[in-house]
Amino acid sequence: MEKNDMMNDEDIKEFHDLDKLKDPYKPLPHGLVIADSQINGQGLFTTRRLVRGTHLGESHYRFDGKLVRTPLGGFINHSNEPNCVRSQVRVKPHYDKWTITIIEDIEEGEELTLKYTMYDPEKI
């Protein structure tokens, strides 16, 4: 694909198989809400218990160098003792996504957090 070309339907399908999704656009995963945070502004909070290893979804996408942030990526706050980790996945050349995974059990009402610097892959 040339840099100035638009993505076609096949590129989109290959990037993220929309046919497998019941609802292709879900702003936040089930069990998460945006609420006022004591850390900074607003943050992501649980409405139910979530266990270590739960994959929450994509926080960011990069298409041909342009970064797109999802609500999941836009509202998760920083902590030096995070309960989530973000991982980069190369989907295909020029297309990356970042996913968020829980690294410790989180009780209902707790805020989700990431460490905005480098992550330790051993904690996943």
Feature-to-residue mapping (PLM):
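Conserved catalytic SET/PR domain of SAM-dependent protein methyltransferases, capturing the structural core
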Residues: 1-124
